[in-house]
Design a protein with these regions (language model features):
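Loop-rich non-cytosolic ectodomains and luminal regions
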Residues: 1-167
């Protein structure tokens, strides 16, 4: 996604059978990113500010959902700011993630959910793009990676990692 003048809104549909999952936001230095998470009932966390390192615990009383938000910088000299959101017993429905930044430099960010089999099929981004889904180890520098091909459909496999790395 990209933060505009105000903020970027990302919608996540959480399925009925979801017992918990982790979502990661990776930003670009030198920006500092903030999240405000809204539950299906409309309860909000308020702005959670990223930084060098820290944690915040939030309980959504109406949904009985617990959220642990951790933020840190991967490389403190010039690395990417990261916000990790751990949802425990998430209520089913549409969760809104509002992303803001300091408005410095490139204002793009990436938001990831776990891969297949680590999350229910009913939990997904309502609007997603498959073109920036490279995962480790294919996202390192000086490495050529390949995706998987589905010969039945004559195209890349739907679960294939593909796209450009973050750097």
């Amino acid at each position: 996604g990209q933060v505009s003048q105000n903020d970027a809104k990302v919608e996540v549909k959480v399925g009925e059978s979801e017992y918990g999952f982790t979502m990661e936001l990776w930003g670009l230095a030198p920006n500092r990113y903030y999240v405000d998470i809204e539950s299906p009932s409309g309860q909000k966390t308020g702005r959670i500010q990223g930084g060098l390192s820290g944690q915040r615990y939030v309980t959504f009383l109406l949904e009985k959902t617990r959220l642990i938000v951790e933020y840190f910088t991967v490389d403190t000299s010039a690395g990417a700011p990261v916000i990790v959101m751990r949802f425990q017993n998430p209520a089913p429905g549409i969760w809104n993630i509002y992303v803001r930044d300091d408005g410095v430099g490139n204002r793009e960010f990436d938001l990831w959910l776990p891969i297949t089999n680590f999350i229910s099929e009913d939990t997904f981004f309502l609007e997603s793009t498959p073109y920036n889904t490279l995962v480790a180890p294919s996202n390192t520098g000086l490495l050529i990676s390949c995706g998987s091909y589905n010969s039945n459909t004559g195209s890349l496999a739907i679960d294939s990692s593909r796209g450009f790395p973050r750097n």
